[in-house]
Amino acid sequence: MYKRQDSGIADRTPFIRIGNELSCDKRFVPYLLKYSLDDCPKLTDIQQKMARTRIFVGTTTAINNRLNLFTLKHFQLAIIDEASQILEPDLIGILSARHQQHNAIDKFVLVGDYKQLPAIAQQSAEEAAVTDLLLRNIGLEDCRNSLFERLYKSSPDTCRSILHKQGRMHPAIAEFPNQTFYYREQLESVPLPHQLEETPYEAGLTPQDTIDQLLLERRMVFIPAEAPDHLTCSDKTNPNEARIVATLLGHIYRLTESRFDPNRTVGVIVPYRNQIAMIRKEIARLQLPALQDISIDTVERYQGSQRDIIIYSFTIQNFSQLNFLTANTFQEGNFLIDRKLNVALTRARKQLLLTGNPHILGANITFYKLMEYIRLHNGYLETDALSFCRGDFTLPSYRKNWEVADDTYSLPAHFKQVFSELIAPPAQLEENETYYREATACLLYTSPSPRD
C-alpha cells in the first residue's frame, strides 16, 4: 500500500490516475487505479468507487488501453491537453467510446498550439497525402496533421477560443515570439512574480568577471561560434559551441548555487543527439557534480517542459543543415512560423542564451531577424568562442533612440514592382536564400542617392 501525499488537488478534488508505475510521477502512484481500488473487496464496492470519482486522468495511450472504463462510467466532459501533438488515430477510440446506448463522453475540449511541433509521424509527405475527395472536403488532407489543427482551421469562431495569457516567459523573452509567431494572438504575461523581476538572478549578486556581468544584465544573449577548424568533426557536433555551453553552465551554477535545482534552474537544447555527448564531455571537465543531472536534449523532447534558463546550441556547420533545422516551418499570411524555433525559445522562464554560427544562421530570414532583435537589445556579442570562454569580450551597448536623417525620398514605382516580384517572394518563402541575398545587394548598390 502506497502512502498518499498531498498532490496539490487530491485532497480537495479526488481523482484516479489511469496508467502504470513506470510512466507515473512517484507523487501520483498512490492514485493509480489499482491502488485506488485496494479498499474495494467487492465488485459493488468498485462500481460505487468509480461512480463517486468524478475525475480520471491519463495519457491517450493509457485510456485507449482501458476503454472498458467507459462501460462502467459516463463522462460529461473530456479535456485533451497537448492535442496538437496527437494524431487522429490515437483519438478515435476515445472519441467513439460508448456507454450503454449513448456516447460515453458528451463534450470534448481540445487544448493545444498548432504553431509548436506537431505529432511525430514516420510517413513522408507523399505517403501521408490524402486523395479521397470526401476526406479532403472535411479538411483531412495530410495524415500527419492532428485533429486539433484540422478542426481549428475549419471550425467557426464560436467553437474556438484563444488563451491570451501566458505564465512562463518573462516579457523580454516573450516579445520576439509574439512579434514573429503569435502576431495574431499577442500573448500577455499573467503576470506571475518571476515575470515582474528586473533581473534573471537574485538581487545583490556581484559579478566576478565579464561572463557573470553578461548573465546578470541581459535576458537574451547570442554568442557567435565559428565552425571547428578540423575536418574530422561530425556535422552534427560543434566543439566550440559545446565549450561555450559548458562555460555558461559553470557560471550559472556559481550564481545560483544556493538554490540550484537541475530539474528547474537550467536546461540545454540541441538539434542533434551527437552534440549532447560532446556537451556532457565538456561539463565533466568542470568537476561540478550538480551539473551532471541537468537535462540536455532535443527540441522535440523539450516540448511541454520549461526551465528558468534555457541554452540553445544551434550546432549546425553548413547551409544544407538549415533545411533540417527549419523542417517544421509553414507560412501563415505573410509570416513564416518556425515551429521548432518557437518551441526552443518559449521553454525559457527567465533567461535565454543562444550560441551558433551567425554566417550560416543568417541565411535564414527568421534566424536573421532573431539575431538582429537580440543585437538591438544589447545581447549580441562581437566575439569568438575562445575569447568568450576566457571572458575576454566587451558587453554591447547600442543607442536605443535612433536619430532619423532629414533627407527622405519616395521609392519610384518601378523599384517597388521589382522588389515585390523578385525580392519579397524568396524572402517570405525561403525557397532560394542565396538568390534573395544577391538580388537585395544588387538593388541596394544601384539605388539612387536621396538627392537624385
What is each PLM-predicted segment?
Residues R4-T13, Q47, T61-A62, L69, ...:
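Conserved helicase motor core of SF1/SF2 NTP-dependent helicases
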